[in-house]
Design a protein with these regions (language model features):
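Secondary-structure boundary/capping micro-motif
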Residues: 1-198, 205-215, 229, 236
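Conserved, non-catalytic sequence blocks in retroelement Pol enzymes and Pol-derived host proteins
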Residues: 216-221
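Low-complexity acidic/polar repeat-biased segments
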Residues: 224-226, 234, 238-240
């Protein structure tokens, strides 16, 4: 079983995902069951983290720290300009809110280090948690709208119904995007990142591949595509 755990950690699965995946792949095999806490214990406590030393993929663990650190679930409140006009999340169709119908997306930008001009645009489909990632050299409103158009335009209409986004000025050209794609944009309330929680969670997973402070001008499109591929192969507990 240890080899199975190590193999999954090297695929960048979290300990929780490793535990769930083993149960799914080896039904009825009690010898292949291991709890999330047991994996964490082996990584950080038992034998001074001996299991961690067996990982062969650089940064296979989501955090480089040598111990577990509790995470605050309270949203950070930053100072930023807001878009005064536009459809609010309260106007979004009920089918998007309950994830019953595919085609409703959440999106955001991940701003890189360095000159901070290069960024990643991330999109997550709310029903399937399917991820799209694209690298963008500049992130003015028109450039963001045009890249989003390129990302969405290749999708069938039935899986491109709406997009939920923060009220930041980077989406000031949302009408340009909607006219080009037919996809309506709905804006979260100020300081409410949990209203696009699937995207927030996915951005955290993307940081496994590109840690905070990464200069995205040094990242290739091939690397971005590989991160997208691995994320879409990753088992999701919410889909079980």
């Amino acid at each position: 079983m240890r080899a199975q755990v190590v193999a999954r950690l090297n695929r960048r699965l979290s300990p929780e995902q490793v535990s769930a995946d083993l149960a799914r792949c080896f039904p009825g095999r009690d010898d292949m069951r291991v709890s999330t806490e047991t994996i964490y214990h082996s990584l950080y406590v038992q034998g001074r983290g001996a299991l961690r030393q067996e990982l062969c993929v650089a940064k296979a663990l989501r955090s480089g720290r040598k111990g577990r650190k509790p995470r605050s679930r309270l949203p950070a409140r930053g100072r930023r300009p807001w878009i005064a006009e536009g459809p609010r999340i309260s106007d979004r169709p009920a089918e998007a809110a309950d994830r019953a119908v595919p085609g409703h997306w959440e999106g955001d930008l991940i701003i890189g280090g360095g000159d901070q001009r290069t960024c990643l645009i991330t999109l997550v489909e709310r029903s399937s948690r399917f991820v799209l990632i694209s690298r963008l050299g500049v992130h003015d409103a028109h450039s963001v709208a045009d890249r989003l158009t390129a990302m969405i335009s290749g999708l069938p209409a039935q899986i491109a119904r709406s997009l939920t986004w923060d009220q930041g000025v980077k989406m000031a050209a949302c009408n340009r995007f909607t006219v080009a794609t037919g996809v309506k944009v709905y804006f979260c309330d100020p300081h409410s990142p949990w209203q696009r929680g699937s995207n927030e969670n996915t951005n955290g997973l993307i940081r496994d591949f590109f840690p905070k402070g990464t200069d995205f001008s040094t990242v290739t499109d091939v690397q971005v595509a590989e991160a997208q591929r691995l994320l879409n192969l990753r088992p999701r507990k919410t889909l079980d």
